[in-house]
Amino acid sequence: MSHYLIGDIHGCYSEFKSMLDLINFNLKNDIIWIAGDFIGRGPDSLKVLRLIYKLKRNIFVVLGNHEINLLLLYAKIKKIKEEDKLTEILNAPDLKILISWLRKQPLLKIDKQKKIIMIHAGIIPKWDMSDLITNSKKVECELKSKNYKKFLKFMYIKNNEHKNIWKNNLPEIIKMRLTLNIITRIRYCISETEIDLLHKEHPEKSPNHLIPWFKFKNNITKNYSIVFGHWSSIKDYKTPKNIYGLDTGCCWKGELTALKWDNKLFFKIKSK
């Protein structure tokens, strides 16, 4: 059995299908993990979503910020933007089935035997493995619950009372909002506990006080490799040896990238 890890697809169905052909994807033998943001921005998000749903026994996903965005749109908490390119999904006859499945998907995947963690954006240095699992599970439980719309509404409300600083004594709902932002949106940290959600540029062009989250020492990365997406502008940036960034900007005329974990071989499909 081969284990493949794929970066942000962003609705690029043609490239996704080409990748499955390139790796000779075999339903009997292969497993794929996708690092979130498999919908949004690109031209064929509905096709991508339906294919992943159809192959859900072999293809596993983590939620990214664009999947959370779809849930917010479905719940009518925010208005759709043209650049979202999610109208086709929202008008689909099987929308309820797809949304029901989507909100049951995890924020992270862990393979304890292979020592892999997949997450869409990243983590904060302050967290250990127990923190990561506990905090993500709390958010996942809310997304699965009947009250998920109420939860999402609170996640979306802008609140300046609490800055983006992790403290263990924060109210539980604030910690859940921070957790969701960290896991699906983080790029930079200001310190071991404070995150920046504004800057997206390459580290060489960022303000001096901002440090990529993976540059901090962390207890988790002593024993596990972390595979993530989200940050296409660092596709040529050298990350630590056990940190793998797989977003190579497929929806921005870049590439779709897959990593075969068994032999660390990379596969790439150019954007069409």
Curated annotation (Swiss-Prot):
The keyword S-adenosyl-L-methionine does not apply. GO terms for molecular function: bis(5'-nucleosyl)-tetraphosphatase (symmetrical) activity. It is an enzyme of class 3 (hydrolase). It catalyses: P(1),P(4)-bis(5'-adenosyl) tetraphosphate + H2O = 2 ADP + 2 H(+). CDD domains: MPP_ApaH (cd07422). Its EC number is 3.6.1.41. It comes from the Bacteria. Keywords: Hydrolase. Belongs to the Ap4A hydrolase family. NCBIfam families: apaH, PRK00166.1. Hydrolyzes diadenosine 5',5'''-P1,P4-tetraphosphate to yield ADP. This is Bis(5'-nucleosyl)-tetraphosphatase, symmetrical. The gene is apaH.
